[in-house]
Amino acid sequence: MPLFHYVGGWEIDQKLIIVSLLLSAVTSYGSGIEHRKKGYVDDGLIRRALYGAIPGAMIGVTFVMITGTDFKSIFKILSVVVVGFVIFKMVRKVIYQQSNLTAGKEAQLGKMTLLSCFGGFLSSVMAIGAGMIYVPAMKFFGNLEARKSIGSSLNIMMVVIPFAVVAHFLILDNNQVENLFDESVLLLVLVLTNFLGSKFGAVIGFSMFSEDFLIKLFIAVLSITWINYLFDILF
């Protein structure tokens, strides 16, 4: 969403949410399938997380409908808070090199499901895959190692995001639907490039990049996004 809004000049509305969610879904499929091939998933925890994530996504769609014209401001404030919190937690992990040993610990399924519900909500409201929520939920409450946390998170998104896309599409007005179809060629190109990029990116990541490097790269990307939202609110 930030790329379309700040670079492409698109307005933050339900049309942009649908496009951003569509690309997030395609990315999750491209990378999620590769993680599944390697066995980096836990289907039991994925099913449990979906009990929270799918209702959360529906609640998020309802929230967007209710807030109406106030949605843009609420979106940016919520983005600053949530993305800022995620950056803070990840930076702490890098600085202190915290080792979260999961062996022998019992999964906290209630907390994992609740956090997954929040992830589904953010998917609909912030137009993101919500991996920033699902991965910690899988790792810290599901007690999965890093690769399985990422793979399970992607497989959750493969199910949740299509629900949010359909729900948002059903409440578009006629003008937004026409505008969306006018961009069909661009969307097709973006879908193909995102799918191939995420697929090959996952394969390369398995063999070439350490978890520490990927975390630092993710922090850098999130920080740029956070600064954009903050400046937009303040100025």
Regions found by a protein language model. Name each.
Residues E11-S20, D42-R48, N143-L154:
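Membrane-interface alpha-helices at helix entry/exit sites of multi-pass transporters
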Residues P2-Q14, G30-G119, L170-F235:
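Juxtamembrane transmembrane-helix boundary motif
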Residues A103-V135, F141, L154-I161:
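Helix-loop-helix "hairpin" substructures at the membrane interface of multi-pass membrane proteins
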Residues M1-K15, I133-K148:
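Interfacial segments of multi-pass membrane proteins
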Residues M1, V19-G32, F63, S99-G104, ...:
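Hydrophobic alpha-helical transmembrane segments
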Residues I17-A25, L50, I54, S153-I161, ...:
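Transmembrane helix-bundle signature of multi-pass membrane transporters/permeases
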